Amino acid sequence: MAKFNRIHLVVMDSVGIGAAPDANNFVNAGVPDGASDTLGHISKTVGLTVPNMAKIGLGNIERPVPLKTVPQEANPSGYYTKLEEVSLGKDTMTGHWEIMGLNITEPFDTFWNGFPEEILTQIEEFSGRKVIREANKPYSGTAVIDDFGPRQMETGELIIYTSADPVLQIAAHEEVIPLEELYRICEYARSITLDRPALLGRIIARPYVGEPGNFTRTANRHDYAVSPFEPTVLDKLNEAGIDTYSVGKINDIFNGAGINHDMGHNQSNNHGVDNLVKALKDENFKHGFSFTNLVDFDALYGHRRNPHGYRDCLEEFDARIPEIIENMREDDLLMITADHGNDPTYAGTDHTREYIPLLIFGKSLSGHGHIPVGHFADISATVAENFGVDKAMIGESFLDKLV
């Protein structure tokens, strides 16, 4: 019998808690990640007031230097630790896949200087459309259409851009490049990015409408992902007939594998929490696992190196935690974690190789305190043991520590 009837995992995208032991093997603008510390530097440079996470034990997590503005709790309300990544990557897909039990020994490719000419030329030859070379770099999805949408409306050229993650995105005005044509081009791009030197996690169709100065992206986005190369704990739960709910981009990250209830994309972190609360309240969701990704920390503030905005975003999420807890049942378990770091005070604009925090709360738990430092996949091993399914490739359960 399951110790917890429902487990809810919330990933605060990019909220790292200090450089990982191998951080110097990863770089940002030529600077090794060894001094990165997302939460530590936010707390130190702009202050951080997150009383609800602090109450569970955020400030108590073992660190070389305590978080400056997050107090340590003498009597925390939950369990806490930090987890180390073993996979060879610091991107979203790698982090989430490892959390669900996989060891990624061959990282996806990212293109900080844009995609190679060979890929762009192949897409041009297939589509019969030119590619706007100036857009070929990591770009904000709204900024790229503001900057190049007017030109696309005049010329019909393709807007191809990337991000910190291993993705190729194609933006197209629906009245200039019809959806069916955009999807066909994306399917072709998917077919040529399945191996090195361009092994990409996702190809994303990004249609938009409107006039210059007033463009808006539409709901006709489509992701062409790759499925995890081995079964994850999500697959094992699904095969056992256990409910698996996804909130935000979780469904995209896993290409739908192992997910039987998708709550859809989030318009914002707050919208994501709204969707999680809907899942918590779902009368039909009696037994199973929910998996939520909140991406604003990363997309809006980490990559843009905006510590003030990042702090505000953390505080906004923290203020929603009581609502999440209020809607939990007595036999629910909440786990709050991250997938990598993205220190907004650091060099460059890329993710940072860091430990991730793990906060655990349940209304039925009488104990509290520190759990030994472990690895990302320990989360899924714990979920697997709770629901009586096999774990995936890696991970050690800490279920027996939760009393």
UniProtKB/Swiss-Prot annotation:
Biological-process GO terms, alphabetical? 2-deoxyribose 1-phosphate catabolic process; 5-phosphoribose 1-diphosphate biosynthetic process; metabolic compound salvage; nucleotide metabolic process
Per UniProt, the keywords (alphabetical) are:
Cytoplasm, Isomerase, Manganese, Metal-binding
Provide the E.C. number(s) assigned to this enzyme.
Answer: 5.4.2.7
Query: What is catalyzed by this enzyme?
Result: 2-deoxy-alpha-D-ribose 1-phosphate = 2-deoxy-D-ribose 5-phosphate; alpha-D-ribose 1-phosphate = D-ribose 5-phosphate
Q: Which residues are involved in binding Mn(2+) 2?
A: 298, 303, 351
Q: Does the keyword Manganese apply?
A: yes
Class of enzymatic activity (EC top level): isomerase
Its GO CC terms are:
cytosol
Q: Name one GO molecular function term.
A: magnesium ion binding
Q: Name one Pfam family in it.
A: Metalloenzyme
Indicate where this protein resides in the cell.
Answer: Cytoplasm
What does the Swiss-Prot or TrEMBL cofactor note state?
Answer: Binds 2 manganese ions.
Where on this chain does Mn(2+) 1 bind? 13, 339-340
- List the pathway annotation: Carbohydrate degradation; 2-deoxy-D-ribose 1-phosphate degradation; D-glyceraldehyde 3-phosphate and acetaldehyde from 2-deoxy-alpha-D-ribose 1-phosphate: step 1/2
Q: Which cofactor does it need?
A: Mn(2+)
Q: Which PANTHER family match?
A: PHOSPHOPENTOMUTASE
Family to which the UniProt record says this protein belongs: Belongs to the phosphopentomutase family.
What does this gene product do? Isomerase that catalyzes the conversion of deoxy-ribose 1-phosphate (dRib-1-P) and ribose 1-phosphate (Rib-1-P) to deoxy-ribose 5-phosphate (dRib-5-P) and ribose 5-phosphate (Rib-5-P), respectively.
**Protein name (record):** Phosphopentomutase
Organism (species)? Streptococcus gordonii (strain Challis / ATCC 35105 / BCRC 15272 / CH1 / DL1 / V288)
The gene coding this protein: deoB
